[in-house]
Amino acid sequence: YLGEDYRAVVVASFPGSGRTSIGDILLVNGVPLQMTEAANDPTSPVHTSRITEIVKQQSRYPVGYIGLEQVVESSGKLLEELLKQAEEHRIIVVDARTARDIDAIAACCAASGLKIAAIDPGSFTAALAGNLFKRKKEAIQKKLLCGIGSASDLTRQQLQYLKKNANPLVVRI
């Protein structure tokens, strides 16, 4: 629990792995999420591609939304909309199609002065951290906790890649 003063910003996109969101719809390699193998996931099947609906099903807090047209318009408009949404919503879903969109969202979140909890597959968190901490990259050993809530083939492939390249401690629950 982070406290009432935090806002969760959900950026479900990860363009580098084929995940983008347009019009509150999560696309995986151009296919709506509910039409992918995620629909048949044995542990948590997905029945909608609408990100706000998925979040609403998992939270008791009001969910706001910022569309792609606001993300690409200008940083001033995006910041204005972020602050407006934060007044009424604890959770804000934001569309992104490209890494540049994600960088723009992260820059606005950092500039907003809001306490932000990043909810995403990773690229938004990295961009937000880069904006918040603006420091040189250093080779620092850090611990990282990852939670995997899916049993899809893609998730298994990603976990195999992680095992091969990072030597993680994997705990199955």
What are the residue ranges of the model-derived segments?
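Cap/lid and interdomain-hinge subdomains that line or gate substrate/regulatory clefts
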Residues: Y1-I102
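Short, ordered loop/turn segments at secondary-structure junctions
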Residues: S13-P15, S123, I173
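Flexible, glycine/charged-enriched surface loops at secondary-structure junctions
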Residues: P62-E69, I91, K115-P121, P168-I173
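Structural motif
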Residues: V94-A99, P121-S123, G147-S152
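Short, well-ordered alpha-helical microsegments
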Residues: D101-I105, T155-R156
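Soluble secreted/lumenal catalytic domains
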Residues: C108-K115, A166
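An anion-binding catalytic pocket shared by soluble metabolic enzymes
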Residues: D120-F124, L128-I140, G149-S150
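Redox- and metal-dependent alpha/beta enzyme cores, enriched for Fe-S-associated oxidoreductases
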Residues: E138-I173
